[in-house]
């Protein structure tokens, strides 16, 4: 018999558990018996296959063809060295791919879903993979269901099972027994792994985990998530292909020019001409570009993770630098998320948090703590901060919540949702069933018939309503969040939203969630950086405005409005309306999407924060969706590009700063690589047009491109971050990474290095062509190593600490310098890399000319400054 056909008591008995859950020992035994609650992963690619895939790159294929033709034409040494260097690059690429997979696995581990289980009679938060058969799992709106289970307690739970059944509408769940065989979609007393709760709450007993779940049985049919290339990577790939095609065209022209100049065409002439063309191709193609960008993005992602921002989609790393609007929630993000009750209002009196409270006034506090889902166990507070504040206030005034909950057990409920802005529960108090409701004052004020007093109760008059609204406004203007607490008698525990009326008012509770200490500074940083912070909250307009003014989001030039103000505006009207609004209060998820879309239509890059299941559409709509790691639902995290592990607005600003620096570092690395390649191209073209011998062999350029260029480029990618990036305006949305400024730098610096290289060639040519080639190669190689220091900043770096603040760059220069000198001085390597021995004077000339490139570029930077 299937669990859905059995009584819940029988299911519990069959699984050896009860409503208090498993003990920790039982859970560990069951984990050994049933295994971890995770799907078997698809086989990862064999490292050898990964190695072979490195040869699929378009640029590498061109080099392989060049090597093969070189070998056929008799230049065996060049062919062998090209293959060796390409192989080394393939090995490095394979190792980097494996490391990237490991990094991705660690990030997945950091953002793994959790579950609330009852063990040893207490609610505990555990990783989803540690849930086991027999566990009692608490499911609330926004939670993913991480295993299959039978519902044993239900409070209006609705579940999105579209991942399992394809049904787009949420399914209403129940706990009653079902008769006969039922298809998956009709098993309404079961919950299945991969679905998520959209409304209400429930408890279930886990019946199967891992590959035994329904989703596990069809796991082979599920699409695995694959990391797509980011827009930057795609752009650079396309750039590389276009560059290659252009270079092939130029190579054909050079080949034709060389053949045209010759007296007659024979194998030797063709071989020499082809060597020229190959040298040009190798000089132009930035072999390491793609892998270096990947490495820099990977390192940047790890750095962001260490600073509490987990990147879930790699393109977010690039997008962070362009963010111009941050739409942020208030509670927990801009504030501390540590609500404390400051004042209560009862029967015309405002009572301070530290004043004595009598029994009548205490009933207001007790009702607030009973109509409440928060839990306190072993010093850990689980639940909504507002509800935790009510419980803490009750305990502070010697009204023990656990005893009250045992005495007045909850028999029914209507969970809170952002549309109703209310929560209701039913308890038996004395001989009567009482429905307790807490929620927004503006929602409840029109549903009150009577008011509790020190002497009993009386009718709720127009004067009472005016007083209630007045006190609510006063509290809100103080930046306090206000809840009304009401009660009424009911005849049954089966309540519905239609019963939420005809209340007796107990009073108001005013609490405060103070701003985080760092919020004001983060807002100031945003404004300096040309980023506009906007508060979007479900809270009261006056409360939101008070906090926004305190931290600097709202000033005399900004407006604060309620969400309903935008409901009747057309998209065109909304585009105009959003321009001067800094605070939106009482917003719905639909409002959030419209606000984000309006700014996007105006050409801005928008970041949006969210935590609830209803925030998922807005998070997906935003350019950078940011989910809360602590309070956020699994659905929100799944929709987001980035997850904050500390729920802190300041972390978003830090992430933007890191994103800007990362993008700038990638620009520096690209500028470094392409300016060096430009120098090589110019040198080869100059030699061709001047009918000089080819200045480099292919092996020389490959040595530079793949060995001595890669390390400085990676070092530039991890250049220490500069805070001055937050003094700049956001990068335009569709701006190419190869801006006019970067292209100018590439051309100018390429010319400088190219000129120095050809000077070295002419100096060496005094002796012979082999020495000329060796000096040109050495100067180009060392100039590019020195040029790494030029690319650290747009400003001069000589005589500054910035020159030496990157240990990776110093190390890269040292390694490259040692490798170059080994090639020049070790006889065996001289033969392999086709270099001639140099005299001390020639070697010093190479050093001097290479240093000259640094000096000239630094002088040009000073002139430009």
Which residue ranges define each predicted feature?
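C-terminal catalytic subdomain
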Residues: 756
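Generic alpha-helical transmembrane segments
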Residues: 708, 753, 774-788
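A C-terminal functional module that forms or caps the active site or interfaces directly
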Residues: 791
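Membrane-water interface at loop-to-transmembrane-helix junctions
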Residues: 732-750, 770-774
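Conserved cytosolic headpiece of P-type ATPases
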Residues: 1-727, 737-738, 751, 762, ...
